Amino acid sequence: MVIIFLTACSAHQKKILIYANSKIQVDESQKNITVEDGTTQVEKELNFSGSDPVVLVVNSPRGNYSIEAPEDGYWLANLGTDTVVGSLQHTGSIRQTRVTQEQLQVQLDSLNKLVKGANISEAAKNYFIIPGKIAKITSLTGAKIFGPYTPVPSAFDAGSVPEVYKFYDIGEVYDIIHKLTEMSKYKYEKESGKTEDDDDSVYTIHPTKK
């Protein structure tokens, strides 16, 4: 019975990924965090065992405050100056080579809702984390999170981890929305000699006529 109890206790794990805009200083307990002003995206990962809630005390240029991870799982703490948004990535072996105007509009609608914090839910696996807050991303501490300004490498093996998440600084998302909006102003025509079933076909782009 004692062995079972010890095994159960050792299974508890809390992983906290910290985002900040400058150097992150952590004391030996990993529970007292100091961040400074800056403009460079910095990440630091902290690991904790045990069933007790983890409370981090943060000392920052915007004041002192605490954040808490009350249960096991993978958490994201935003100690930066901008909101970060992100979601679960649906990975697979099929590569889509074309995007229709309808699909483009769906992406735009989704991104516009995301930057407003709309339709955010645990069930949808999407997140809107304002500065100074922490959120549980997943119960799977073996998941992989790619942070702001860090693209998912083309050679990354998504099968090596149970889940993949991508997060963006909210400014990045506005840039993406702008680019997609510009793309939505164009129409695509099939290159001469190509068929509708040819996934490798090339399209000629023309400005959409009003």
Report the location of each language-model feature:
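Structural motif
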Residues: 16-25
